[in-house]
């Protein structure tokens, strides 16, 4: 009787954990879900990366920037991190940066996750252990990504997983990196909102 009760409890807990991960993980997004991000300024972002360095968003000025929020338990996040890695490799010679932000987990867990899933990233992976950045940026589901232009002004937001290195998304990114470079030349950076809540 006790064994059956324990089995039932484990099954219920497992089901609840699975349901929570499904609800909190956004479905795969399409190009039309890369919606204009209408804020006039972006929140502050300064976090410690897995290599121990402090990475500040303001230092990325002059680059098109993708700020990508994820977690190791988020199933769609795994493929999206690999997609972002392919995009980073393809655009390595251009003014383009990716900042991946893990939400609510210790660095060791993130390192194991990346190794286990053979995700070799050439962009900083930042740790938002207390979820302050997640709250400041208004992240409601994972994955969520924000695209900033080269003056660090809000450009696009997408809630849900996206395949970044295929068209039409790839063409949109390349256009912003190359064709619009002249239009942001000398443009004053958008004001970064005050500290993270």
Feature map (PLM): residue ranges:
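N-terminal "domain-start" segment that seeds a small globular fold
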Residues: 30-57
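Bacterial N-terminal signal peptides that target proteins for export
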Residues: 2-16
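Short pre-active-site segment immediately N-terminal to redox-active cysteine/selenocysteine motifs
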Residues: 63-65, 69-73, 141
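Conserved redox-active cysteine motifs that mediate thiol-disulfide chemistry
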Residues: 69-86
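Short, internal strand/loop/helix patches
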Residues: 99, 114-151
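Thiol-/selenol-based redox modules, centered on thioredoxin-like
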Residues: 147-197
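Bacterial N-terminal signal peptides
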Residues: 13-25
């Amino acid at each position: 009787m006790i064994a059956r009760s324990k089995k039932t409890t484990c099954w219920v807990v497992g089901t609840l954990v699975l349901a929570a991960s499904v609800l909190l993980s956004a479905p795969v997004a399409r190009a039309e879900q890369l919606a204009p991000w209408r804020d006039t300024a972006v929140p502050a972002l300064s976090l410690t990366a897995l290599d121990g360095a402090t990475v500040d968003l303001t230092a990325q000025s002059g680059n098109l920037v993708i700020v990508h929020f994820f977690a190791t338990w988020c199933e769609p996040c795994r493929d999206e991190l690999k997609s972002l890695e392919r995009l980073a490799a393809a655009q390595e010679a251009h003014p383009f940066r990716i900042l991946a932000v893990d939400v609510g987990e210790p660095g060791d867990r993130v390192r194991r996750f990346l190794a286990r899933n053979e995700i070799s990233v050439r962009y900083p992976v930042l740790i938002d252990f207390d979820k302050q950045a997640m709250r400041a940026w208004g992240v409601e589901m994972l994955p969520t990504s924000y695209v900033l232009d080269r003056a660090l002004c809000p450009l696009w937001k997408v809630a849900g997983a996206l395949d970044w290195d295929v068209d039409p998304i790839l063409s949109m990114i390349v256009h912003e990196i190359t064709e619009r470079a002249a239009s942001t030349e000398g443009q004053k950076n958008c004001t970064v909102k005050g500290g993270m809540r």
